[in-house]
């Protein structure tokens, strides 16, 4: 890896993809939205691999595919080798940014990131919830108080935007303040970020499922709502949490939620992850519109800030599961 030596430790992962006959090509939401060989997992990994080896010049055209990934892990789960494509492409982003390459939108994220000192809080709601979905943020704080009593809120960002935009060093430095702590997270992407930093994390939806008898049995909304559960990529394939939200929804709705045809380990991405709404907005929109069409008009309930925002931008009626939990306590 003479051109990008920082990717040497990922050599095996890259070569596993490069020499594979593209068996996971149908798993990627980005290349399904824009059918190009460059955008399938093989193409993205190949572009970074050949750039790292010096076989192609370090140019934007070869760097850009590294950002054509939502981090949904669908290709990993479809792979016989369980190859970590998402993690490898994040390291590729870091290598390209170090060499002055990367999408303009990604550079703006890095320029605008303002490091915050941790407030030492136990409840990590997430920046997207705080900024874009304040009603859910308030519901999360209310839920935590009802379940556990007074809970301090962590106001600092988890640092995930740094990792997604291509600054691994700043991400790791920022994350040191979370190491060794016990935290409850609302957004699964934030949970994975602080977990990688060494925090012990549980999800608020998990804690609600553990105290299921504290939730009033539904329906508490007149029974008129048809709700279809969407498994967020980071909650499901990332953290392996599938049962807790279904336990909670069955309790508060008075019946099991509707399901997408592709669910649990095979659930499909909302298009909201990996900075895709910023770096490839058209592809992100297409992915979200397909998921909304798959919902057949039912209200979508999920547990991920970026998914809520993506689905709403595509015209869907969307509820975050935290608001249902709060209403049932």
What are these regions (language model features)?
Residues 1-66:
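Ferredoxin-type iron-sulfur electron-transfer modules and their immediate structural context
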Residues 5-9, 14, 63-67, 77-329:
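Iron-sulfur cluster-binding electron-transfer modules in prokaryotic oxidoreductases
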């Amino acid at each position: 890896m003479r051109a990008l030596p920082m990717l040497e430790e990922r050599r095996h992962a890259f070569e596993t993809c490069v020499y594979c006959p593209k068996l996971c090509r149908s798993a990627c939401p980005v290349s399904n939205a824009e059918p190009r060989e460059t955008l399938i997992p093989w193409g993205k990994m190949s572009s970074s691999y050949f750039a790292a080896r010096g076989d192609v010049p370090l140019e934007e055209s070869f760097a850009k595919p590294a950002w054509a990934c939502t981090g949904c892990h669908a290709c990993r789960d479809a792979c016989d080798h369980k190859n970590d494509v998402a993690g490898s492409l994040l390291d590729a982003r870091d290598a390209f940014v170090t060499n002055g390459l990367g999408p303009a939108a990604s550079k703006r994220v890095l320029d605008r990131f303002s490091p915050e000192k941790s407030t030492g809080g136990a409840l990590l709601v997430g920046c997207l919830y705080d900024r874009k979905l304040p009603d859910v943020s308030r519901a999360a704080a209310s839920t935590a108080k009802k379940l556990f009593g007074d809970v301090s809120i962590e106001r600092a960002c988890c640092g995930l935007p740094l990792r997604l935009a291509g600054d691994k060093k700043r991400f790791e430095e920022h994350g040191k303040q979370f190491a060794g702590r016990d935290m409850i997270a609302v957004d699964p992407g934030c949970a994975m970020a602080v977990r990688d930093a060494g925090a012990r994390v549980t999800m608020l939806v998990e804690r609600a499922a553990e105290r299921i008898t504290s939730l009033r049995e539904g329906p508490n909304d007149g029974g008129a709502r048809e709700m279809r559960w969407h498994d967020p990529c980071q909650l499901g394939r990332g953290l392996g949490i599938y049962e807790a939200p279904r336990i909670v929804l069955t309790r508060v709705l008075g019946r099991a939620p509707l399901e997408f045809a592709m669910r649990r380990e095979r659930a499909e991405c909302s298009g909201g992850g990996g900075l895709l709404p910023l770096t490839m907005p058209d592809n992100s929109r297409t992915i979200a519109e397909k998921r909304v069409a798959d919902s057949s008009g039912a209200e979508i309930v999920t547990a991920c800030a970026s998914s809520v925002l993506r689905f709403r931008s595509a015209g869907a009626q969307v509820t975050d599961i935290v608001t249902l939990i709060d209403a049932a306590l």
